[in-house]
Structure formats: structure tokens, C-alpha cells
């Protein structure tokens, strides 16, 4: 997907990028490739592939109508090089973005990226989701939590649901359909007072399969969750 094809797809969805936004995506690509030589950020560095499999892929929740340009508070867990939240922030400047990542080198990259892109309303924290999920500053404070190819739902639910306000949404982006995964996650979702409201398969413009799953939080999360760092993955609910 060339940058021009990317812009055209957005126009077809009613979004016309300004010159500033186009430059932000261009700068994002350049910094991603530069920094990828120092630290491992992505296996994808070809320009057209980055625009398709990182930029376009990240904004799927916007293109499908699940996020609008309003002062939503969005937490991105395990964003790595900033996907999906930074492309969404470029598109919709009104949203407020927080990223938690376990690798400090990636946080350093994100700080430089945000500075170069002149983004405001972005906050980056180094650490584990399990630890932040028990912190009153972060717990039950977000409208939306996003996670792109982070963990299977049985584990992901415990890492993300505690951060949501009641009626907040987890938006999980994955490469393939999640039917069996959701069956395995039924107990975890029930324990965390949350339920799947959207499970939708779609395709990227090149035909690659993708899945978006949205989970809604119905009640406050029991205090014992999330458990200590590493436990959700070793002993899923």
C-alpha cells in the first residue's frame, strides 16, 4: 500500500488527511526504520508494507466506526513501536493516549517519536501491565484499552479489563479469527465481569485475514485481579 493509496482509502471512509498528518506518518515511517537498526521494533520495514500492515492495520477500529474523534482516554498495552494507538492519535488528535510497555528501549523510542511528531496528550510508562493494573492512578480510569497481537484472550482479559471504567471497552486486534480462543476465555471473561460484544473477521486490502474483538466491562473488577506479574500467562483464568 503506497502512501497515496493509504490516503485514498481514508478519503473513502470520510477522512481527509492534512499535510501535517501526512508528514507525521512519513516521519513515523522514517524513525521506525532508523530505530529498528538499533533496537528490535518490527520485522516489517518496507514502506508499502509498513503503511499497510502497521498504519492501516492500526486504524481498523476507527475505519470500522468503533472509535471517534473525541476526548476518549485510551490505554495501549504492549504497543511496541506504538501500534495501534499512535496511528489512531495521528488520525484523531482529540483522543488521549497512554502506553505501557515492558521494555524501556521502546519507551525511549516512543518519547522521541512523540516529540518529532509534535503530539500532545500522549503518556508513556515502562513496566508490566499486572503492576499498573493494581495502581489506583491507572485502575478503572480508561474508556478504551487496545491490544494488537499481545496475548490470547484468556490471558489478555486479565491484563486489560482492570484498567477499564465500567462500560469501557477492550479492543483486541489479531491476525486471525478468534472463535476457539473466545471459548477458552469464557471463564476469564465471566470472572472479570465482562463480555464479548463484537467478534468480526475482515480483510486488509491485500487479502490478509484480520479479526477485531471488542469486550465490554459490566462491573468493577474484583480486587485480586490482575494477579502478580507473569501469573496470568502461567496460570490463565
UniProtKB/Swiss-Prot annotation:
Kindly state which keywords UniProt assigns to this record, in alphabetical order.
Answer: Cytoplasm, Methyltransferase, rRNA processing, S-adenosyl-L-methionine, Transferase
Q: Which Pfam families does the record match to this protein? A: GidB
Region ranges (Disordered): 216-237
Cite the EC number: 2.1.1.-
UniProt GO molecular function: rRNA (guanine-N7-)-methyltransferase activity
Q: What class of enzyme is it?
A: transferase
GO cellular component terms listed in the entry, alphabetical order: cytosol
Could you identify this protein by its name? Ribosomal RNA small subunit methyltransferase G
